[in-house]
Amino acid sequence: MAKVSLEKLLRIPPSLTQSISQTKVDYLNLGHSGLRVSRPILGGLHLGSRKWLPWVLDEEKALPILKAAYDLGVNTWDTANVYSNGESERIIAKALSKYKIPRNKVVLMTKCYRVMSDPERFDPGSGVTMHHELADYSKDYVNQWGLSRRALFSAVEASLDRLNTSYIDVLQIHRFDHTVPPEETMSALNDLIRAGMVRYIGASSMWTFQFATLQHIAETKGLTKFISMQNHYNLIYREEEREMNQYCKMTGVGLIPWGPLASGRLARRPTQEEGSLRASCSAHGSLYESDDYNVDRIIQRVAEIAEKRGWPMSHVSLAWLNRRVTAPIIGFGSVGRIEEALAARGKELSRDEEQYLEELYVPQRIQGHS
């Protein structure tokens, strides 16, 4: 009887087999932490209100994308309090509720630092976040942004309310705050973790010396250190390779880059029409100069390898990137885009192909730092 029971326990349960077969992603440890995140991570910049940016998906279109992502195994969702002035966080909470997704089965990542629309005059389309340097001159916005103890606790409390959750898995500081002593920032972040409001902390685009300073303060004072860096990194913007990527690799910080496909440029030929509303809007005033000769030549080489291998261009770009990071953050405009990205799973380029893609790169001005 005992032998029969043991044999039954040793069999893989059908429910586990089914779950594995439905999972179309890999899960990797985020830096030296024990937290495992999906590759890719879903980016929440695309979800919110079209009043904020014309290519953002309103709730009606955003909810099915979150459901599809979850069903396929993309259970790590990144957002920020300023995305559509909080609407992105609210829609994520709506998805968890509407589709009865257990909170413990998703990893929620959000960010704070920038100023948001005043709740008393709330406007999801407000561009106040682009003018945080003026906030401290306003009676309504003073102390409502940045990385002070006051601002951090207020931001996290508000994000918890919008996300309808008791904790944030990874709280990321959106940029470095020059106006606050770094010791105050790291102490407050540590206290947020001790209070149970946050599980882990991460950071986003900044200079390496700034990030190293924050990590050094945490280490010397026995405070919680950052486990992730969300920086700007892709085949046509590789300035982070100079210091930040190497520092993170050396110190066990996971890289989760934004803009992995350069607003879609690395997923289509230079002469091809924009594949999304965001791409067409980004053609003017984009981070990526549309007439950069070397950039276009790199993209053309992505197209050559894609044609040779019979892959979409996005798979070539992601195959190059995935060897160098933990997980890229991708904003999906449709369920089809999710499926395309997940089909890149396990694909690798040869060293010769990687060198062919890399050799045309020339240094660029630093983009995305505060």
From Swiss-Prot:
The active site is at Y83. It comes from the Eukaryota. Coiled coil: none annotated. Pfam families: Aldo_ket_red. InterPro entries: AKR_Detox_Biosynth, NADP_OxRdtase_dom, NADP_OxRdtase_dom_sf. The keyword NADP applies. Keywords: NADP, Oxidoreductase. NADP(+) binds at residues 78, 204-205, 230, 259-269, 333-341. Pathway: Secondary metabolite biosynthesis. Disruption phenotype: Impairs the production of destruxins. Substrate binds at H174. Its EC number is 1.1.1.-. GO terms for molecular function: oxidoreductase activity. It is an enzyme of class 1 (oxidoreductase). Aldo-keto reductase; part of the gene cluster that mediates the biosynthesis of destruxins, insecticidal cyclic hexadepsipeptides which induce flaccid paralysis and visceral muscle contraction in insects through targeting the calcium channels and vacuolar-type ATPases. The aldo-keto reductase dtxS3 converts alpha-ketoisocaproic acid from deaminated leucine into alpha-hydroxyisocaproic acid (HIC), which is the first substrate for destruxin assembly by dtxS1. Belongs to the aldo/keto reductase family. This is Aldo-keto reductase dtxS3.
